[in-house]
């Protein structure tokens, strides 16, 4: 009795009337779909690729486990270059390492450089083959040298919309120079007609 009295009082205070019976509404009105949340997005090879590229500054292991196969191969900067690997230890082919390769590389890059602006200028795909390129700015944490480099990346995506092969390229001559001492120079002999270049 007291319960119904309180309900009646609350209804009168907020201006609600009794609910109409279901049969009082003509037609069939299905409930609307729930609003899209941050984890609700249409998965396509291109959108998966973009998600992985954009998680570089703050690697999300759970997201990467979801979007990268356990045996994915990551080719970073070069197939195999011991000199480059000595400067940037993540350079080389990481065969069948899976999401852990992404975590290790993305994290280590952040330890070596202070990341600046990163842009995806173009991205597109042909079924499971996707590619993108853009530019980024980075400042070496050891010497404080800032460089701007173009980058390009390619991925192969399976029918489950998971990346199983990933390749990243950049202007390594420029990015490696951010770790070069001003007191060190290297002589390059490239022109067949003679002459040298110093860097």
Swiss-Prot record:
Disruption phenotype: Completely abolishes the production of patulin, shows reduced sporulation, and leads to the production of a distinct dark-red pigment. It catalyses: phyllostine = neopatulin. GO terms for molecular function: oxidoreductase activity; polyketide synthase activity. Residues 1-21 form the signal peptide. GO terms for cellular component: cytosol. SUPFAM superfamilies: NTF2-like. Patulin was originally used as an antibiotic and specifically trialed to be used against the common cold, but it is no longer used for that purpose since it has been shown to induce immunological, neurological and gastrointestinal effects. Genotoxic effects of patulin with dose-dependent increase in DNA strand breaks in brain, liver and kidneys have been detected in mice. However, more recently, it has been proposed that patulin might also have anti-tumor properties. This is Patulin biosynthesis cluster protein F. It comes from Penicillium expansum (Blue mold rot fungus). The gene is patF.
């Amino acid at each position: 009795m007291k319960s119904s009295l309180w309900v009646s009082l609350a209804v009168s205070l907020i201006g609600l009337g009794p609910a109409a019976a279901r049969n009082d509404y003509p037609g069939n009105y299905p409930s609307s779909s729930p609003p899209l949340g941050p984890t609700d997005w249409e998965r396509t090879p291109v959108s998966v690729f973009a998600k992985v590229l954009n998680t570089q500054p703050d690697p999300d292991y759970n997201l990467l486990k979801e979007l990268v196969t356990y045996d994915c191969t990551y080719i970073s900067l070069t197939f195999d270059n011991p000199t480059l690997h000595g400067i940037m230890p993540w350079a080389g082919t990481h065969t069948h390492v899976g999401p852990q390769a992404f975590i290790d590389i993305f994290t280590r890059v952040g330890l070596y450089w202070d990341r600046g602006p990163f842009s995806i200028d173009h991205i597109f795909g042909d079924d499971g083959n996707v590619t993108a390129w853009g530019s980024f700015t980075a400042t070496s944490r050891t010497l404080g040298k800032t460089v701007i480099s173009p980058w390009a990346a390619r991925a192969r995506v399976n029918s489950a919309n998971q990346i199983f092969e990933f390749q990243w390229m950049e202007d390594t001559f420029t990015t490696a120079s951010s770790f070069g001492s001003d007191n060190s120079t290297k002589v390059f002999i490239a022109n067949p007609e003679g002459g040298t270049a110093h860097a």
